Amino acid sequence: MSYEAVLFDLDNTLYPYAPCNEAGKRAALDALRERGYELDRAAFDDLYATGRRETKRETGGTAASHSRHVYFKRGLSRHAGEPDPAGALAAGDAYWNGYLAEMSLCDGVEAVLDALDAAGTDVAVVTNLTTRVQLRKLVRLGIDDRIDLLVTSEEVGREKPSALPFTSALAELDRRPSEALAVGDNVETDVAGANAVGLDSALFVADGDAPADAELSERQRPDHRLDAFADLTEVAA
């Protein structure tokens, strides 16, 4: 089946997430050590987890829940017993610089984008996180000029699996749900969110194993499973 539009998730869909996250953490730890923090990796991981946990608890469902600068702002305050704005800024900047330096597209992404372009298919990226960070990722991956639209949870005010990121993209592209396919790695935010809107869904996990259908509720089950990103050409183009 061909589609008039494909809505891609970004993180752990177009590129593997885990090595980038690890590179970002190493860079942030180095930045904090340069500022005089005597942290081993275990202490850093505890600081990061504390900041992340507090941020998720208080900002869940918003793009801010993913902000590494907020994680470090809160984590450093708990660790040091007082705020350290400069340290949080340095660690957050170092994290994203290290993260982006490690990024690379999954095999097959460029070929799929070529096929979709040749077929005249609209291509959007619909993603949870802040707009500036996601723009940096698209530029780093070299696909910023290959997509027709970026929609972030920050700009629409709601996170997937809310319908709003999906419907905002469809409205901008002037496409109906029946004309579009959503592709992502997360069975809740990507697959269940797309299914609820009436989009066809495809599950592709760039880094890690996809859960079996038997482990999923009906609303989390994708219409298509992709073992390799290049398989999308047969599904969508």
Predicted regions and their residues:
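N-terminal helical cap/lid subdomain that shapes the substrate entry/recognition surface
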Residues: Y3-E110
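Extended, well-ordered alpha-helical scaffold segments
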Residues: G87-A91, A118, R146
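Asp-based, Mg2+/Mn2+-dependent phosphohydrolase catalytic module
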Residues: M1-V6, A18-P19, D114-A115, D122, ...
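A broadly conserved amphipathic alpha-helix scaffold signal in soluble, globular proteins
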Residues: K73, D114-D117
